[in-house]
From Swiss-Prot:
GO terms for biological process: bis(molybdopterin guanine dinucleotide)molybdenum biosynthetic process. Transfers a GMP moiety from GTP to Mo-molybdopterin (Mo-MPT) cofactor (Moco or molybdenum cofactor) to form Mo-molybdopterin guanine dinucleotide (Mo-MGD) cofactor. GTP binds at residues 8-10, 21, 67, 98. Coiled coil: none annotated. This is Molybdenum cofactor guanylyltransferase. It comes from Cereibacter sphaeroides (Rhodobacter sphaeroides). The keyword Metal-binding applies. InterPro entries: MobA-like_NTP_Trfase (IPR025877), Molybde_CF_guanTrfase (IPR013482), Nucleotide-diphossugar_trans (IPR029044). Pfam families: NTP_transf_3.
Amino acid sequence: MRLFGLILAGGEGRRMGGTDKASLTLGGRPLVTWVAERLGPQVEELAISANGDPARFAGLGLPVLRDEHPQGPLSGVLAGLRWAAAAGADALVTAPVDTPFVPGDLAPRLWLAGEGACAVAEAGGRVHPACGLWPVAVAEDLAAWLAAGEARVMGFAARHGAARAGFPDENAFLNLNAPEDLARAESLLRKDA
């Protein structure tokens, strides 16, 4: 099994005042670094899905994939699937840039839950579909889904009967969507220190 990884960093950060969430800092380090350090060791290759100037990620040494037609996170997933398929990967594991506490065993647990098919993360009674595993074989169906105007990640996951991989830590998928979420994450860091 060849798993590739993708950090979804294409959002506009509207609830963060239009700030690029990838460059927001937590514990003095950019969010993109947190996710790269957690997801990178779990996959064979890692890339970032982002629009705008790719130079802002130059220090990470990772490929930056652009959306063909920006329609939300699934556009990034499609770019990642095509990149992974071209390199001979079996599946793509995705995590948003604003989930700095993504588990160190995300990829293997998603693979086991879905037995190689689509799978999404679940913690604290909530499903986190952007933290998912997507076989490269679903790329063309995803392209058709987006072309039909569909854009919901959970809708596409349900279309493919995505399994759910349960995680015990409800903070593992804490999304930093607003300033108060960032403050909560800083508090969790201090508590764990």
